[in-house]
Amino acid sequence: MNARVESVRALMDERGLDALLIKGKTLKRYLGTVTGSGCKVLITRAGGYLIMDGRYVNEAADIEHDLEFRVHEQGVSYLGELAILIGECDIHRLGAEASQVLVSEYQKLCDLDVEPVLLDGELARMRIIKDEYEIAAVQHAVDVADDVYAKVLEHLHIGMTEYEISALVHYYSIAAGAEAMSFDTIVATGERSALPHGRPTMR
C-alpha cells in the first residue's frame, strides 16, 4: 500500500493539495483498504485516515496497518469527522474524486473553510501504470479464465441450456479462487450470439 499512497502524494504535490479524500470503490480497492460505501479515506502529506462507522471496524482491523481509524456513529455523516481532521491536519486545499462528490457535500466542504479541488482524469491516469503485483494478478486472472474455459468445454453437450453453461462458468471460476463474477456471465447461442452482452436464458 505504501508505494501507492506515495503515488497519491505525488499527485497531491502536482496539484498543490494538502490532502485527498477518497470515496470511490475503485480507488479504495487500489489502495488495498475497505471498500464499503460507509468508508472514506483521507490521505494527507504526513499520514492517512480511514473514516468509517462501527460496522467496518472488525473488517478494517484485519487488513489495515497504515491508516489511522476515525470512527463515527452509524447514520451520522462522515463530514463531522472530516471537519475535525481538516482542523487537526491544517488542510486548506482538499482534493476529491469529481464523480464521487455530491453537490451538497461540495457546499458543506466550502462551509468548512477548505477549498475543494475536484479531480477526474488524474486519478485514472495514476492507476494506468501497473506495479508487479497488479501485473501478476492480471496474468493469474487470464490463466484462470483459460482454465475455466477449457473445463466448461469438456462438459458441453447438445441440449444444455445457456443457464446451465453459465452455472458451470460460475462454479469453476469460484472453485479456482475467484471471489465473484465481475458481471453477469455472457452465454448466448444461435442468433443470440450477436448480442453485445448476451445474458443466459433457458434456451
Where do the language-model regions lie?
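N-terminal accessory/capping or targeting/presequence segment of soluble
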Residues: 1-84, 143-144
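Flexible, acidic/His-enriched mid-domain "rim/lid" segments that flank
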Residues: 3, 46, 77-181, 192
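Fold-independent oxyanion-binding glycine-rich loops
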Residues: 23-25, 34, 53-54, 97-99, ...
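Short acidic, glycine/serine/threonine-rich loops at helix termini
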Residues: 33, 62, 106-108, 128, ...
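Acidic, glycine-rich loop-and-beta core segments that form the ion-binding/anion-interacting portion
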Residues: 176, 180-203
